[in-house]
Amino acid sequence: MNVGIKGFGAYAPEKVVDNAYFESFLETSDEWISKMTGIKERRWASENQDTSDLAFEASKKAIKDAGITPADIDMIIVATATGDMPFPSVANILQEKLDTRKVPTMDQLAACSGFMYSMITAKQYVQSGDYKNILVVGADKLSKITDLTDRSTAVLFGDGAGAVVIGEVSEGRGIISYEMGSDGNGGKYLYLNKDTGKLVMNGREVFKFAVRIMGEASTRVVDKAGLQSDDIDMFIPHQANIRIMESARERLGIEREKMSVSVNRFGNTSAASIPLSISQELENGRIKDDDTLVLVGFGGGLTWGAMVIKWGK
């Protein structure tokens, strides 16, 4: 059985926050932010928008694109680090919003690697033969956990959501190879402060980890797929920082024009990062049926996930 993406959808909130916004209360500038991160603007959800609301908008599009109805969904997996509340899960809340059957629901917390973790998890369930249409969502409202007094992190984060329906696809298409991993020793470098409820990051250590693991994991999944770098049509890394992305691209040996860059528009949206990039490239006609994509993410934990996927239903 070939398992892949049967339907796709993404959503970014309407509010655009450009770099000039931060100049009024932080010692920073548009020039510095752009040079160091590649970010020009990001989207922030409104105060009355929860993560589940972002997930709902993306999910409706994915279900429609798959040519099915909510009644056909037989599992929901949401990757998020910013649930509406500790429980019930975002997946549970999303089930009600979509009015699906009483199917199993779960959230997966692997921070920015969450979308990769959830897609790989869904693949296993479909491969078992017990499930046919699994809704996987990467959604985060990072604006609610961003410390706006911290110059090093305040400018980085945005909000958004992306969703896919994972199921059986045509011969020769779908997920070809994948890898997941974690290193709990790095948990202290990127975490949510339990007292303040705000994100804390050791940028230098996270940068070192990300540069190494994104390149290594991407290379391994390409090798596992029996492919060469020349066989890759599009490289879609987690959109954390343009310098990290460029380093990973160089390690993989991919031409610059084959790398998706959406960090300039959305900032770091955690679990939504990779699907928002996919959405951009689909809109621009840069992803076509039977294209070979490499997706790779890293995040708090520290965690990582990568895959090679042949695009198409």
UniProtKB/Swiss-Prot annotation:
Residues annotated as catalytic: C112, H238, N268
Listed EC numbers: 2.3.1.180
Region ranges (ACP-binding): 239-243
Transmembrane parts of this sequence: none
Compartments reported by the entry: Cytoplasm
GO biological process, one term: fatty acid biosynthetic process
Keyword Acyltransferase attached: yes
A single MF term (Gene Ontology): beta-ketoacyl-acyl-carrier-protein synthase III activity
SUPFAM superfamilies to which the protein is assigned, alphabetical: Thiolase-like (SSF53901)
Assigned GO CC terms: cytoplasm
Pathway: Lipid metabolism; fatty acid biosynthesis
Catalyzed chemical reaction(s): malonyl-[ACP] + acetyl-CoA + H(+) = 3-oxobutanoyl-[ACP] + CO2 + CoA
Quaternary organization: Homodimer.
Free-text note on domains in this protein's UniProt record: The last Arg residue of the ACP-binding site is essential for the weak association between ACP/AcpP and FabH.
Family: Belongs to the thiolase-like superfamily. FabH family.
Name this polypeptide is given: Beta-ketoacyl-[acyl-carrier-protein] synthase III
